[in-house]
């Protein structure tokens, strides 16, 4: 009998959530995603030391200002790690915009353009890169602007239906609704244990997937942030799933029959009026879990971005 990983690949695009090239070589995903936390982890891998040196040399060549050098080195390192990963995948790499910019639309647009230029200068076409943005109102608006320039975006830290709806209406290429972090919040609040079927993170992605398909939105749904393989199996059929290498290996090692759960029935309904900024902010605020997790997620990425920049600053 085939393993779960091979069966899942038949109807869901598998994406590796890692900055580790060796892990990517092992699991052979189609796409890969990175974030500031994964880049910080990757920067400690010995084989990446030359990339750090290259990022430092690049930053020094661009500016004499220390603060600008640190920013340029961090951006260059993110792209250099992305370039290494692209050598081993046929699809796209997601590279994240500095989380400190999460409430500044123009700054996110500028950073997205800069990252794409760094990839293009290295010979990588922009259609192989997704710019990752936090799913704040400002991030979604930045995504809308970048998409119109032909720069595809991955809207991340997505915990609520309001965020998902606004992303679809903005016409972004892809969203990353989080599963495990939603489960974490409910477990902490209720003390309950959840099955894959009752998992609130799984239910959230299923609702978003169904809404997108029945309203004819082209935005790709890529479930993210998994705590166990049960959550992944419960979302079989989702457009894409981005999964850590350890859970991908677990799926490879497990044999059994995998049933497709999410299916696009091809029926489309009329779309509702566009969500206004006021409605978005109110709906997000009404959702305590999403409000807390979005804020926590941004703070966490900022902490790791600062750690990465501190390490780079010591080498400048």
Curated annotation (Swiss-Prot):
Active site: 132
GO molecular function: transaldolase activity
Record-listed E.C. numbers: 2.2.1.2
Protein's job: Transaldolase is important for the balance of metabolites in the pentose-phosphate pathway.
Keyword Cytoplasm: yes
Listed GO CC annotations: cytosol
Gene3D superfamilies per UniProt: Aldolase class I
Compartmental location: Cytoplasm
Catalytic activity from the UniProt record: D-sedoheptulose 7-phosphate + D-glyceraldehyde 3-phosphate = D-erythrose 4-phosphate + beta-D-fructose 6-phosphate
Lineage top rank: taxon: Bacteria
Assembly description: Homodimer.
Name of this protein: Transaldolase
Pathway annotation from the record: Carbohydrate degradation; pentose phosphate pathway; D-glyceraldehyde 3-phosphate and beta-D-fructose 6-phosphate from D-ribose 5-phosphate and D-xylulose 5-phosphate (non-oxidative stage): step 2/3
Keywords: Cytoplasm, Pentose shunt, Schiff base, Transferase
Coiled coil stretches, renumbered: none
Single Gene Ontology BP annotation: pentose-phosphate shunt
Family under the similarity heading: Belongs to the transaldolase family. Type 1 subfamily.
Enzyme category, top tier: transferase
InterPro entries registered for this protein in UniProt: Aldolase_TIM, TAL/FSA, Transaldolase_1, Transaldolase_AS
């Amino acid at each position: 009998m085939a393993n779960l990983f091979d069966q899942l690949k038949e109807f869901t695009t598998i994406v590796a959530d890692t900055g580790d090239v060796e892990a990517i070589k092992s699991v052979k995903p189609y796409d890969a995603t990175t974030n500031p936390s994964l880049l910080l982890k990757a920067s400690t891998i010995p084989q990446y030391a030359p990339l750090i040196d290259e990022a430092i040399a690049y930053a020094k060549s661009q500016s004499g200002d220390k603060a600008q050098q640190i920013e340029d080195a961090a951006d260059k390192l993110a792209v250099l790690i992305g370039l290494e990963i692209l050598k081993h995948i046929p699809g796209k790499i997601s590279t994240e915009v500095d989380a400190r910019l999460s409430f500044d639309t123009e700054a996110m647009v500028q950073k997205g353009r800069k990252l794409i230029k760094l990839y293009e200068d290295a010979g990588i076409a922009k259609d192989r890169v997704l710019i990752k943005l936090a799913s704040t109102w400002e991030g979604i608006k930045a995504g809308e602007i970048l998409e119109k320039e032909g720069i595809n975006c991955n809207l991340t830290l997505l915990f609520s239906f309001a965020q998902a709806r606004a992303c679809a209406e903005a016409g972004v290429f892809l969203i990353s609704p989080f599963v495990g972090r939603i489960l974490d919040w409910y477990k902490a609040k209720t003390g309950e244990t959840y099955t894959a079927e009752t998992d609130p993170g799984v239910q959230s992605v299923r609702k978003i997937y169904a809404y997108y398909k029945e309203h004819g939105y082209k935005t790709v749904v890529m479930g993210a942030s998994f705590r166990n393989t049960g959550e992944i199996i419960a979302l079989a059929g989702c457009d894409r799933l981005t999964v850590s290498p350890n859970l991908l290996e677990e799926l490879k090692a497990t044999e059994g029959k995998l049933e497709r759960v999410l299916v696009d029935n091809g029926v489309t309904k009329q779309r509702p009026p566009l969500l206004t900024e006021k409605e978005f902010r109110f709906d997000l605020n009404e959702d305590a879990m999403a409000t807390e997790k979005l804020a926590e997620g941004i703070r966490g990425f900022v902490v790791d971005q600062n750690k990465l920049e501190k390490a780079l600053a010591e080498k400048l």
